[in-house]
Amino acid sequence: MVKSKSPKGIYAARKLRLKRLKFRRSQRKYKTKILKLKEKYDPLGGAPMARGIVLEKVGIESRQPNSAVRKCVRVQLVRNGRVVTAFVPGDGGVNFIDEHDEVIITGIGGTLGRSMGDLPGVRYKVIMVNGVSLDALYKGKKQKPVR
């Protein structure tokens, strides 16, 4: 039998922990965090939400086997000037959004911050328009203020 190189004993916890720390660089999450890749490459800069100005409304075709034109908007972020595509959820949600409106976007909820479902290349969704939630606008609880 080959003897294990790991310490075994009542007081071995520190030694075992330090041994594990040597292999952390091979873990994807640790490497992303330590190299600050989220802040560098994420348009939102690691933040949960961002404010932006609507440049145009676009219809994006969904992937197979679905067939639909999903309503999206091109948004220029205020914080860094980057342009991203954001999905507008809900039935008739795009009717509440006009060009040059101020919107708040957040992640769409895909795995590892990527796109979700049948929307190719869309990582964000609109949650607020001119300071009013999109949900309140659908339900008729509030009206959209004019900027």
UniProtKB/Swiss-Prot annotation:
Classification via Gene3D superfamilies: Nucleic acid-binding proteins (2.40.50.140)
The keyword Chaperone is assigned to this record = no
A Pfam family it matches: Ribosom_S12_S23
Taxonomic superkingdom: Archaea
* An example Gene Ontology molecular-function term: structural constituent of ribosome
Which residues, by range, are in coiled-coil regions?
none
User: Can the keyword RNA-binding be found in this entry's annotation?
Assistant: yes
- Assigned GO CC terms: cytosolic small ribosomal subunit; ribosome
UniProt keyword terms in alphabetical order: Ribonucleoprotein, Ribosomal protein, RNA-binding, rRNA-binding
| Stored SUPFAM superfamilies | Nucleic acid-binding proteins (SSF50249)
> What is any one GO biological process for this UniProt entry?
translation
What PANTHER family is this protein classified in? 30S RIBOSOMAL PROTEIN S12 FAMILY MEMBER
Its family?
A: Belongs to the universal ribosomal protein uS12 family.
Q: What does this protein do?
A: With S4 and S5 plays an important role in translational accuracy. Located at the interface of the 30S and 50S subunits.
Q: How does it assemble?
A: Part of the 30S ribosomal subunit.
Q: Which HAMAP family match?
A: Ribosomal_uS12_A
| The name this protein goes by in its record | Small ribosomal subunit protein uS12
Q: Which organism is it from?
A: Saccharolobus solfataricus (strain ATCC 35092 / DSM 1617 / JCM 11322 / P2) (Sulfolobus solfataricus)
Q: Which gene encodes it?
A: rps12
